[in-house]
Amino acid sequence: MKYAGILAGGIGSRMGNVPLPKQFLDLDNKPILIHTLEKFILINDFEKIIIATPQQWMTHTKDTLRKFKISDERIEVIQGGSDRNDTIMNIVKHIESTNGINDDDVIVTHDAVRPFLTHRIIKENIQAALEYGAVDTVIDAIDTIVTSKDNQTIDAIPVRNEMYQGQTPQSFNINLLKESYAQLSDEQKSILSDACKIIVETNKPVRLVKGELYNIKVTTPYDLKVANAIIRGGIADD
């Protein structure tokens, strides 16, 4: 089976002085979360579409779905975790407890605040996860990347045509993800910033799927302005 996990666990601290977490902020008169969710509803492949959100925002999430007449029976709202990967594992545990997990089950995980993903990106994630077990959505790095450990001087300048910017979705065979996460030490888990690193840390390959430049993550006031411009310009019409 195929599952979607929408990660709505952020509290929006980088958005500044706003009354709601960023996933509930309006984008063209509709919460960002609803824009994102509508993309997944259009994909018939999914057995369940699971939204993971902070415990204190679960009721608000359900109320928002009702307000915007989102009634797809596949949608479930659960409590997120303490961080991104803990939230993903909460979704996995929920799937396991309600449906069980088969060897070929896959999950497509996606940031609730990336509302401009496309049908193509979702379908290619599903197919690549089924075929390869783990997949990341990326775009070519446009700018030169530098690394610095002391935040003052350059340590290295990697070859740009080997650099990519990670987006979401990130998609996995569920058993592969579970088993890989279980192999990590507490120290390894504490420095994870990305779900695909769970797989990389256990020396397993992750396939790349091409994203889109406009598949942005809305985390700052500037991002919100860009997102509104994308909608007004019809840039992300799928």
From Swiss-Prot:
How is this protein named in the record? Ribitol-5-phosphate cytidylyltransferase 1
* Record's catalysed reaction(s): D-ribitol 5-phosphate + CTP + H(+) = CDP-L-ribitol + diphosphate
List the cysteine pairs that form cystine.
none
SUPFAM superfamilies from the UniProt entry = Nucleotide-diphospho-sugar transferases
- Is Ubl conjugation included in the keywords of this UniProt record? no
Please give the NCBIfam families that the UniProt record associates with this protein.
PRK00155.1-3 (NF001183), PRK13385.1 (NF009924)
The record places the site described as Positions ribitol 5-phosphate for the nucleophilic attack at R160, K217
Which top EC class is given?
transferase
Q: What Gene3D superfamilies is this protein classified in?
A: Spore Coat Polysaccharide Biosynthesis Protein SpsA, Chain A (3.90.550.10)
GO annotation terms (biological process):
cell wall organization; isoprenoid biosynthetic process; poly(ribitol phosphate) teichoic acid biosynthetic process
UniProt pathway annotation: Cell wall biogenesis; poly(ribitol phosphate) teichoic acid biosynthesis
Name the Enzyme Commission number(s) assigned to this protein: 2.7.7.40
Keywords (A to Z) from UniProt: Cell wall biogenesis/degradation, Nucleotidyltransferase, Teichoic acid biosynthesis, Transferase
Q: Which family does it belong to?
A: Belongs to the IspD/TarI cytidylyltransferase family. TarI subfamily.
